[in-house]
């Protein structure tokens, strides 16, 4: 794996997956085909690497262009592990984040989302979290991390929640676990590009109403970070 001029990524893959990569990942070119392996040149963009990650499991993580092209915003200087987390999320459509408590996962998620929003890949984000931290953690962290973004807390009556969800002014919409069921159809209509679930443990049982509701609001194109 080699990064060339911060524009393209050169990788070597088995021949049996070359066709799948070249037909799925845009801006891919075959450099050299040998008996068992092929060298490919792929445009170094988040969309291309996200597609590539969905096809191939690499021994080492792919380098995210976020590392080169994103200026971290907000009050805090990110730690190395936060940068690594943001880079990982930015090029994985469906991902788990198992960082320990207190390591700044929320900021890592927000920076990755902000990067994709800057590129127009993500327009709106739905954050599903415990009721107790909707404002104290998520809304406040957005103000501290992404001052230029507009968060809305979807809480209260059904009408109150719908007003927040349907308003495109709110780039980040924060809602509690059980509130999702109340406005499920409105969430589907709002067409969120990215759904963030704080604490995947709340959705570990596929037989629960929570899990079934989440499954219904997910679309094939929706990013999901848990």
Task: Name each model feature, range by range.
Residues 17-27, 60-87, 91-94, 103-220:
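SF2 helicase/translocase NTPase motor core
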Residues 99:
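The Walker A (P-loop) glycine that initiates the GxxxxGKT/S ATP-binding motif of P-loop NTPases
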Residues 1-60:
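Charged, low-complexity intrinsically disordered regions
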Residues 224-226:
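Catalytic metal- and UDP-sugar-binding loop of GT-A-like glycosyltransferases, i.e.
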């Amino acid at each position: 794996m080699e990064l060339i001029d911060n524009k393209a990524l050169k990788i070597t893959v088995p021949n049996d997956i070359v066709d799948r990569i070249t037909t799925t990942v845009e801006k891919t070119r075959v450099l050299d085909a040998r008996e068992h392996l092929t060298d490919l040149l792929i445009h170094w963009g988040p969309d291309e690497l996200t597609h590539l990650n969905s096809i191939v499991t690499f021994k080492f993580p792919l380098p995210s262009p976020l590392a080169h092209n994103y200026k971290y915003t907000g009050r805090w200087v990110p730690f190395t592990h936060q940068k690594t987390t943001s880079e990982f999320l930015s090029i994985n459509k469906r991902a788990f984040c198992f960082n320990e408590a207190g390591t700044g996962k929320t900021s890592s998620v927000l920076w990755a989302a902000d990067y994709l929003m800057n590129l127009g890949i993500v327009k709106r984000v739905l954050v599903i979290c415990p009721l107790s931290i909707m404002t104290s953690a998520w809304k406040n962290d957005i103000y501290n991390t992404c001052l230029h973004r507009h968060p809305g807390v979807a809480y209260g009556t059904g009408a109150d929640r719908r007003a927040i969800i349907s308003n495109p002014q709110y780039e980040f919409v924060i809602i509690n676990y059980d509130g999702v069921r109340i406005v499920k159809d409105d969430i589907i209509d709002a067409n969120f590009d990215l759904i963030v679930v704080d604490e995947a443990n709340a959705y570990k049982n596929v037989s629960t109403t929570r899990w079934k509701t989440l499954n219904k609001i997910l679309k094939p194109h929706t990013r999901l970070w848990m």
